[in-house]
């Protein structure tokens, strides 16, 4: 399994168990699903609930949302277009410092910066229609994932989470 982590904060953003694709070598798009889960609902294989003690009738607590957000404990945040541009300036600086720290060569950094700029140009016009998510630590210096709802040919919508490829590191487990 591959875990995609925020390069700056180390937060887990998603894993390769999610359906994803790379767009123009600069954005990773992850398809999400709406799910509802019962809290504390653990089913042990082979367990026979009819032979167990009767449940005490506790109130059932459920959580609903996007599978990726719930699984990775992503935290929703908000930006205006101007706030998002300011965030991108500070994030780009922090990212370049991180690239140096991990030993990227000048040519690799130049290519990564070019690809990052391409990615920003793709998402900036959509900022008003996007939702924003940070990693579990809620560190404002880290990567902010972008959620877009895309219309399908049958009229339904598919939630797609976008990540800047050059802000992620892969960890194989």
From Swiss-Prot:
Gene Ontology terms for molecular function: calcium ion binding
Q: Name one GO cellular component term.
A: extracellular region
Q: Which UniProt keywords apply?
A: Secreted
Tell me the superkingdom of the source: Eukaryota
Where, per UniProt, does this protein localize? Secreted
**SUPFAM superfamilies in the record:** Mss4-like
* Tissues in which the protein is found: Expressed by the venom gland.
Pfam families given in the database record: TCTP
Domain TCTP as annotated: residue spans: 1-173
Q: Which InterPro entries match?
A: Mss4-like_sf, Mss4/transl-control_tumour, TCTP, Translation_control_tumour_CS, Translational_control_tumour_p
Major location category of this protein: secreted
- Comment field (misc): Secretion of this protein from cells may proceed via an ER/Golgi-independent pathway, probably mediated by secreted vesicles called exosomes.
> What role does it play?
Venom protein that causes edema, enhances vascular permeability and is likely related to the inflammatory activity of the venom.
Q: Show the PANTHER family listed in the entry.
A: TRANSLATIONALLY CONTROLLED TUMOR PROTEIN-RELATED (PTHR11991), TRANSLATIONALLY-CONTROLLED TUMOR PROTEIN (PTHR11991:SF0)
The record's family statement is: Belongs to the TCTP family.
For this entry, the protein name equals: Translationally-controlled tumor protein homolog
Please report the organism this UniProt entry assigns to the protein.
Answer: Grammostola rosea
**The organism's taxonomic lineage, starting at the top:** Eukaryota, Metazoa, Ecdysozoa, Arthropoda, Chelicerata
């Amino acid at each position: 399994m591959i875990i995609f982590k925020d390069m700056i904060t180390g937060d887990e953003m998603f894993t390769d168990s999610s359906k994803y694709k790379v767009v123009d070598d600069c954005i990773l798009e992850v398809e999400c699903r709406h799910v509802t889960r019962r809290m504390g609902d653990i089913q042990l294989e082979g367990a026979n609930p009819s032979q167990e003690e009767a449940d005490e009738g506790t109130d059932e607590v459920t959580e609903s949302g996007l599978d990726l957000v719930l699984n990775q404990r992503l935290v929703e945040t908000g930006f205006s277009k101007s706030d998002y541009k300011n965030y991108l300036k500070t994030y780009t600086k922090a990212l370049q410092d991180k690239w140096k720290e991990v030993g990227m060569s000048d040519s690799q950094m130049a290519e990564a910066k070019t690809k990052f700029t391409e990615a920003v140009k793709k998402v900036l016009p959509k900022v008003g229609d996007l939702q924003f998510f940070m990693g579990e630590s809620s560190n404002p210096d880290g990567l902010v994932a972008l959620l877009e709802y895309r219309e399908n040919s049958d009229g339904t919508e598919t939630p797609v989470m976008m990540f800047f490829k050059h802000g992620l590191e892969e960890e194989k487990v």
